[in-house]
């Protein structure tokens, strides 16, 4: 029988790793994700998890050790955040290019400078082009579930790409919620044994991995990574369906909330989706025709789902805890690209919110709604990017 425990998202991530039975875990502690490797090391030390826990001197070494272990043919796991993920950047491309299905948990945290240990999505968003799949959890239960799903998709022979699962720093990593821990036997049925056919060590059949590619072959190598990410879209849907059948919890690439008759649909990710849904309920009671959409899978980007969502709205409003310096928020930019060739599309407006752990309040969402309502009334967007909750007196 599944058991329910009250735990932080960090603990939920550690439990997910335990349930997945990786053979090698390599990690270096960093706020706010430190508890993840701590808890896993306890599982290993207590004999609850049969695995090699590698203590390393940096995040660069942690991901490098995982690459080596995955290349040897075993299931691997790591965890990090913020500057730690940034330090891994070089090796993230290598993991994807070598088609190694490593799974990594991320306590989403702002990047320096200035130093900030609180939440936004900039760390993972900055890695969106590395070839890693990206999942974002709204709550602690999703942190556990999405790690299991990430393994299922990553290890599928149609995909064979690494995956990261993000959950908001402190808002989730250090906040306790009830979490259902599934039966080990059911997880074993869901994931199965990892038996790679492309990456392994066999003295009788030596192979070279990650070798030099001349111009005559490099482009084809990059294409296969892109193609695998495209195939992952279908595999993710299949994994979601199987997960629901076995565990009773439903996931979608984009989860909609009260969008059926909405004129304005707000789009976001992570724990902010919970706040947004509460606010939507309040606005509905006040007579506003608003809805919400939560992106669970950011890479591969849910192009078709965004197009279907756009058909329901007159205005798509994006709430983003990230900023692409020199353009807009990343989700807004990607959604704009997804809709560029559509003959009919809604007005689109982007809101930058909550950077560095700043609270996103109902009053701020009201401000965003006012701007979106103005665009709806006038039939045009005055400013595509809007900073909400900014202390303007400090920047002028």
Curated annotation (Swiss-Prot):
Matching Pfam families, A to Z? PFOR_II, POR_N
Share an example GO biological-process annotation for this protein: response to oxidative stress
One MF term in the entry's GO annotations? pyruvate synthase activity
User: What SUPFAM superfamilies has UniProt attached to this entry?
Assistant: Thiamin diphosphate-binding fold (THDP-binding), TK C-terminal domain-like
Q: Which keywords accompany this UniProt record?
A: Oxidoreductase
Q: Which domain of life is it from?
A: Archaea
The cross-references to CDD domains, in alphabetical order and at most eight, read: TPP_PYR_PFOR_IOR-alpha_like
Q: Which residues form a coiled coil?
A: none
Catalytic function, reaction form? 2 oxidized [2Fe-2S]-[ferredoxin] + pyruvate + CoA = 2 reduced [2Fe-2S]-[ferredoxin] + acetyl-CoA + CO2 + H(+)
As recorded in UniProt, its EC number(s) are 1.2.7.1
Return the NCBIfam families for the record: PorA_Arch, PRK08367.1
Self-association and partners: Heterotetramer of one alpha, one beta, one delta and one gamma chain.
Output this protein's name. Answer: Pyruvate synthase subunit PorA
Q: What species was this sequence derived from?
A: Pyrococcus furiosus (strain ATCC 43587 / DSM 3638 / JCM 8422 / Vc1)
């Amino acid at each position: 029988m599944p058991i329910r425990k009250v735990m932080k998202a960090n603990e939920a991530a550690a439990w997910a790793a335990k349930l997945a039975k990786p053979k090698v875990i390599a990690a270096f502690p960093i706020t706010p994700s430190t508890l993840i490797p701590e808890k896993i090391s306890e599982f290993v030390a207590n004999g609850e998890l049969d695995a090699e826990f590698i203590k390393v001197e940096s995040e660069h070494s942690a991901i490098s050790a995982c690459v080596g272990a995955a290349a040897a043919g075993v299931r691997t796991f790591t965890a990090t955040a913020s500057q730690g993920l940034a330090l891994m950047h070089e090796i993230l491309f290598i993991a994807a290019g070598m088609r190694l299905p490593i799974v990594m948990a991320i306590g989403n945290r702002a990047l320096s400078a200035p130093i900030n240990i609180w939440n936004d999505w900039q760390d993972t968003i900055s890695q969106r082009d590395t070839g890693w799949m990206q999942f974002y959890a709204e709550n602690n239960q999703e942190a556990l579930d999405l790690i299991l799903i990430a393994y299922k998709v990553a290890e599928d022979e149609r995909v064979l790409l690494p995956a990261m699962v993000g959950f908001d720093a402190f808002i989730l990593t250090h906040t306790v919620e009830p979490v259902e821990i599934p039966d080990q036997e059911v997880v074993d049925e869901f994931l199965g044994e990892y038996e790679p056919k492309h990456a392994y060590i066999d003295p009788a059949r030596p192979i070279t991995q990650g070798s030099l590619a001349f111009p005559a072959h490099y482009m084809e190598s990059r294409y296969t990574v892109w193609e695998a990410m495209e195939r992952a879209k279908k595999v993710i849907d299949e994994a979601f369906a199987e997960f629901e059948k076995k565990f009773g919890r439903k996931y979608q690439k984009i989860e909609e909330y009260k969008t059926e008759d909405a004129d304005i649909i707000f789009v976001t990710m992570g724990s902010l989706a919970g706040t947004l849904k509460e606010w939507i309920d309040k606005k509905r009671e006040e007579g506003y025709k608003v809805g919400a959409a939560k992106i669970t899978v950011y890479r591969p980007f849910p192009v078709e789902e965004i197009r279907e969502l756009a058909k329901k709205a007159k205005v798509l409003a994006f709430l983003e805890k990230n900023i692409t310096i020199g353009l807009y928020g990343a989700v807004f930019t990607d959604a704009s690209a997804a809709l560029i060739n559509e003959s009919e599309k809604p007005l689109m407006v982007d809101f930058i919110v909550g950077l560095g752990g700043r609270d996103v309040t109902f009053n701020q969402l009201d401000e965003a709604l006012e701007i979106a309502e103005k665009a709806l009334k006038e039939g045009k967007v005055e400013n595509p990017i809007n900073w909400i909750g900014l202390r303007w007196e400090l920047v002028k």
